[in-house]
Amino acid sequence: MSDYTQQLQDKKDHLKTLFAGLDVPEWEVYESPDKHYRMRAEFRIWHEGGEMFYAMFEKGQKAGGASLIRCDRFEAASEAVNRLMPELIAVAAQSAELRNRWYAVEFLSTLSGEMLVTMIYHKRLDDEWMQAAQALQQQLDTSVIGRSRGQKIVLKQDYVTETLKVGNRDFRYRQIEGGFTQPNAAVCQKMLEWACGAAEGLGGDLLELYCGNGNFTLPLSEKFERVLATEISKTSVGAAQWNIEANGIGNIKIARLSAEEFTEAYTGKREFARLKDGGIALTDYAFSTIFVDPPRAGIDEETLKLVSQFDNIIYISCNPETLRANLDTLVETHVVERAALFDQFPFTHHIESGVLLKKKIL
């Protein structure tokens, strides 16, 4: 058994143990490539003896020489990131402006090889730095952002555009520097396919909480009459609106509300001008399904009460422990019809999963 297969088996075993006692069907398993799967990568820049190189540190240890791991290559990162890593450090090393007090770097890439590089400094970035960075950007044919305390200098653009294939259609996504995106694009496509399969035939309208940049929203919109999606981050809402327009989708509306705020609006406890200003009347919708992709903490108690009111629930989770806790409540009213493991993060303990629940027929 390969190292990859073994770690995936360990995750399956963990889920079976964690969800023991719940009536959960056989877990569908979606594998990742075993290398070059991460579209994002972050490194410290380590300066030593006149040389500088990419570095990480041993987990759980203080960053320093004793825990230092030199990273000339990083097999988990996309091939585009690995190609650019030696070129970037070689060019930057030739410029005092780029080299001096360069502290860290973040790479954001796409399946097509588009790249955004954020160079983080412990100094104020001035015109001389900008000139050197523009020359580097042109030489490497990439987009560069400079960051320092209180500074963000965008030389060309602060996003990449990813294209993900779901079924027979390509969806374009603007991914903003610093915004949340699924790091494993190959597995993300499998997650989108699974979610669309889970939604097949449900009909009616869809409510989505925690929609981010519209990652799931866009392909799911093809399975429902109308979609109302909520997200609290202004950056993510802006990206989602661009993504909706860029893909020519006309049945999605975005409300900039947290899950807790939407629960208050839906139950009539509070009125929000943001809904009215967006031309959103909750009474216009006939929701058959709710889609949730919450943060690691899972769904809060009040929102969970709201979720349990829907006939169909599609729940994507980045934390199986909080999913288990939420399911302990949801199985009082619903049955788990499908369950899936998505190996978004190979060779780590992190597990991404998804479940489809349908209301019990009493």
Curated annotation (Swiss-Prot):
<dbReference type="GO" id="GO:0000049">
    <property type="term" value="F:tRNA binding"/>
</dbReference>
<feature type="binding site">
    <location>
        <position position="210"/>
    </location>
    <ligand>
        <name>S-adenosyl-L-methionine</name>
    </ligand>
</feature>
<protein>
    <recommendedName>
        <fullName>tRNA/tmRNA (uracil-C(5))-methyltransferase</fullName>
        <ecNumber>2.1.1.-</ecNumber>
        <ecNumber>2.1.1.35</ecNumber>
    </recommendedName>
</protein>
<dbReference type="Pfam" id="PF05958">
    <property type="entry name" value="tRNA_U5-meth_tr"/>
</dbReference>
<feature type="binding site">
    <location>
        <position position="182"/>
    </location>
    <ligand>
        <name>S-adenosyl-L-methionine</name>
    </ligand>
</feature>
<dbReference type="InterPro" id="IPR030390">
    <property type="entry name" value="MeTrfase_TrmA_AS"/>
</dbReference>
<dbReference type="GO" id="GO:0019843">
    <property type="term" value="F:rRNA binding"/>
</dbReference>
<dbReference type="InterPro" id="IPR011869">
    <property type="entry name" value="TrmA_MeTrfase"/>
</dbReference>
<feature type="active site" description="Nucleophile">
    <location>
        <position position="318"/>
    </location>
</feature>
<comment type="similarity">
    <text>Belongs to the class I-like SAM-binding methyltransferase superfamily. RNA M5U methyltransferase family. TrmA subfamily.</text>
</comment>
<dbReference type="InterPro" id="IPR010280">
    <property type="entry name" value="U5_MeTrfase_fam"/>
</dbReference>
<dbReference type="GO" id="GO:0030488">
    <property type="term" value="P:tRNA methylation"/>
</dbReference>
<feature type="binding site">
    <location>
        <position position="293"/>
    </location>
    <ligand>
        <name>S-adenosyl-L-methionine</name>
    </ligand>
</feature>
<comment type="function">
    <text>Dual-specificity methyltransferase that catalyzes the formation of 5-methyluridine at position 54 (m5U54) in all tRNAs, and that of position 341 (m5U341) in tmRNA (transfer-mRNA).</text>
</comment>
<keyword id="KW-0489">Methyltransferase</keyword>
<keyword id="KW-0949">S-adenosyl-L-methionine</keyword>
<dbReference type="InterPro" id="IPR029063">
    <property type="entry name" value="SAM-dependent_MTases_sf"/>
</dbReference>
<dbReference type="GO" id="GO:0005829">
    <property type="term" value="C:cytosol"/>
</dbReference>
<feature type="binding site">
    <location>
        <position position="231"/>
    </location>
    <ligand>
        <name>S-adenosyl-L-methionine</name>
    </ligand>
</feature>
<feature type="binding site">
    <location>
        <position position="215"/>
    </location>
    <ligand>
        <name>S-adenosyl-L-methionine</name>
    </ligand>
</feature>
<keyword id="KW-0819">tRNA processing</keyword>
<feature type="active site" description="Proton acceptor">
    <location>
        <position position="352"/>
    </location>
</feature>
<dbReference type="GO" id="GO:0030697">
    <property type="term" value="F:tRNA (uracil(54)-C5)-methyltransferase activity, S-adenosyl methionine-dependent"/>
</dbReference>
<keyword id="KW-0808">Transferase</keyword>
